[in-house]
Amino acid sequence: MIVLRRKHVLSARQEQRMLPYGGKIEMSFEFIRKLPTPEEIRRDYAVPEHIARLKEERDREIRDVFTGKSNKFLVIIGPCSADNEDAVCDYVSRLARVNEKVKDRLILIPRVYTNKPRTTGDGYKGLVHQPDPEKNPDFLQGLIAMRKMHIHTVEESGLTCADEMLYPENWRYVSDILSYVAIGARSVEDQQHRLAASGFDVPAGMKNPTSGDFSVMLNSVYAAQHPHSFIYRGWEVNTTGNDLAHTVLRGATNKHGRNLPNYHYEDLNLLLTLYNERELKNPACIIDANHSNSDKQHKQQIRIVKEVMHSRKLNPD
């Protein structure tokens, strides 16, 4: 049970006064309540000092991989979505033991995705929407649950995590605890996602869209690597650009609904050529061994990873 501090509890009259248009339905929007700012949530659920130091160390180690200073591989690993904190903490604690065996060659980043994009908009949308899948959506409790889960997973494992930024405005609720952010296949063409990613201070993986178009993905990387001015959470902001924005190949879906992989040698060679045609910093690619690449057959992932590693031997670039 989560007990909110007093400042989060408003009377019905106070909430009514804070709502746009006096709480009336306007243009089919019903404004329910004002949510706490990221600063308020971060103050109430602060990152412990030792975790903050750990994140700095992990971020530096991960950056060295993207900039070419380190020969280690990044492995972002975990379930499709994270909705049960106990189960997630149990998983990352076991992953930490694996990390001890491979840390001289690999950097393991637990995949703790608290938002779940839906193809049609229907279905469970993740922890932020419904911290309790058996109850109605509660975004206040969802934001708190998201932050607490990320803090607790690091405390449990010593491994800072990755999350998908389905909603760019949620970034600052967890920007002091995450070490990697993914922009999904359905979001990568969206301008707000691209511009927000240009202000992230951790690597941002820009997935190819569901169509599989490499140019869309690379345009997204270009946008994220450059500075921008835009509106963000009610503020006029400037960003400096994210030099760690990179590509993620996750397979595609054709017009007949058939999944098409894009992890083969020919795909990687094409991506390398396209990278060389553009002035992008720290060219890098992460292969998503699931989704359309595996046709969602999880047992295929081991074979896919082995093939990708073999492809690297065929071309030193």
Can you annotate each of these PLM segments?
Residues V92, R105-L270, H291-E307:
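Active-site-facing alpha/beta catalytic cores
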Residues G78, I287:
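Conserved, mostly hydrophobic/aromatic
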Residues S70-F73, V102-L106, S157-L159, V202, ...:
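Short, well-ordered coil/turn segments that N-cap beta-strands
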Residues V9-A12:
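Short hydrophobic alpha-helical segments enriched in small aliphatic residues
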Residues F66-T67, A96-K103, H152-E156, T239, ...:
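Acidic (Asp/Glu)-rich catalytic clusters
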Residues E49-R63, S70, C80-V92, N99-I109, ...:
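Metallocofactor- and cofactor-centric catalytic cores in central/energy metabolism, strongly enriched
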Residues G23, S28-T67:
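N- or domain-start disorder-to-order transition segments that initiate the globular core
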